[in-house]
Amino acid sequence: MGFKLNPFSKKPKDEEPLPLEQYEASEQKILGLVTKKEAKLLAIAGTGFLLDSYDLFIINLVSPILAYLYWGGLTGHQDYPSGIRGVVNAATNIGNIMGQLLFGFLGDFFGRKFVYGKEMMVVIIATILIICLPDRIPTPTAKMMWLFAFRVMLGIGIGGDYPMSASITSEQSLINRRGALLAWIFSNQGWGTLAGCVATLIILACFEKPLNDRGEYTKLNGVWRIQFGIALFPAVIVLIPRLRMQESEQFKNSKNMKSPGEGDLDSASQIELHDFKKKESLTAEFTTSSPSTASLSDKKNPGSVHIRPNNEVAPSSAPSRAPSTTSVESNTEGKESDIQTGSSFVSYFKEWRHAKLLIGSALSWFLLDIAFYGINLNQSVILQEMGFNKGVNEYHILQKNAIGNLIIAVAGYIPGYWVSVVLIEVMGRKWIQIQGFLICCLLFGVLAGTWETISTGGRFACVALAQFFFNFGPNTTCFVIPAEVFPSRVRAFSHGICAACGKAGAILSALLFNKLTEVIGFGNVLWIFFGCMVAGAVVTLILPETANRDADLIDRLEIAAMQQGRTSIIDRSEKWAWWKHGI
């Protein structure tokens, strides 16, 4: 095995799958892109994210209908309180936090197979309860509380999909294709948003005669229920395949503390960690290779460190915490209880080198989602600020609002995701995340400084570009990095924590956006988003570049180093070490 120092170098074409992988590299690819098994994984997990995005963002298109139906919008005296609007908009994100933490923990504790699919059951039940809102509920506020309660439940199911799909995809992908597959799955959020816009336009077209010709706006009561109810179809379709998904072999090995590969680690003294004395780096671009390939790699990368073939440590195997019976035995005497405890989540993150990765991943996601959801959950409000709320009647206003959302989705939202899919293995995660933060920062600065004077076309272009660089930027990488930077034994819960922090930012934005817009104006709210983008770019510097990073192998090497009395496997004197390994 070798470790290449250049995180952006070309991967060997003959790279073999990870030892415990379910997908064979030699399998014929569909259209030269993905294998059949990868396509199945993308369909099962990707459909879930399409559904997740649809459910999360459809409230953006339903909210004006709720204002018309229940808050006097049809009488010309609309009074949809910003506080209640914010709570209803934030409901799914509140549930997301619960679901991400709960299912992330359960995914690590019980296993991926036991948990996967259960979150979709919650989504199906919650969606049915949402569309069954009783008309006999007397007050608009009570109706909104019904929607709030069951959209929280919906959010729990949607939230559970984040850590589970991320962990399963990461553990069942080739290491040099992992980022692209994770980004591909996450990109289905773009299609979900597009589906919401298209579905709304089709539904409105079906109701054109009663709404536009006869002015029977009570029919909107059926429109919003259909908007929510459409999500049931993909949810039911994907449920059975998820329940039948096999356990990740990589995860099973991580939980089997006495697996065959574990014994190899007891010979940790045979790992050539003496290279640290020569100031050589371990944590860089990781590739699995045959002995001959490793030798070739070493010639190109003289700083690589070897594991002897007869004592090969499988990257996907769980780390052993048992004391060595070789030359390191004396160093581990009296430490056995600490080592055994070290397999737990708390013990893993009590070390600063691990804790800072969790902090950096979580904080960057938090800062991103303040701006990302501030824009997306209130895109209809923003379109109104741009003049998209004008029309002959309510029907045309709703139609124009959906068209505006559709244009932004097509112009910036979806292309941004797919540029990430294409370039994530070329540019690396860290660079994409930082440039996305900085360009969004620039765009928000332009909008904030010129909001009162810039033309409608200029506003629209800036918002569309911001959507592009959100997705060709931190919105994609904040999902990918936690799935790659943590080892399998803590991956799902760690990803859940990071995602939950992101949703905390989304909730904060959803609750405060409308109120702050009323108090300080929309332009000044954009200055807050500007600050979040600057902070996000700075926080990203904490994180390592995760392209081709094998977190399980790093975990095992850290344990081997610990057994030899070493505290780190990183050479900070290496050129660009601050970028490769984080500051």
Swiss-Prot record:
Gene3D superfamilies cross-referenced by the UniProt entry: MFS general substrate transporter like domains (1.20.1250.20)
Xref: SUPFAM superfamilies: MFS general substrate transporter
Record keyword Transmembrane present: yes
Cellular component terms per the entry's GO annotation: endoplasmic reticulum; Golgi apparatus; plasma membrane
Disordered: annotated segments: 282-338
InterPro entries recorded: MFS_dom, MFS_sugar_transport-like, MFS_trans_sf, Sugar_transporter_CS
UniProt feature, compositional bias: Polar residues: 284-296
Bilayer topology term: Multi-pass membrane protein
CDD domains: MFS_PhT
A Gene Ontology molecular function term of the record: phosphate transmembrane transporter activity
Keywords of this entry: Endoplasmic reticulum, Golgi apparatus, Membrane, Phosphoprotein, Transmembrane, Transmembrane helix, Transport
Biased composition (Low complexity): 314-327
Subcellular localization(s) per the UniProt record: Endoplasmic reticulum; Golgi apparatus; Membrane
Modified residues (Phosphoserine): 267, 269, 289-290, 292, 330
Gene Ontology BP terms: phosphate ion transmembrane transport
Keyword Lipoprotein among record annotations: no
Principal place of residence: endoplasmic reticulum
Identification of the protein by name: Probable metabolite transporter C2H8.02
Organism (species): Schizosaccharomyces pombe (strain 972 / ATCC 24843) (Fission yeast)
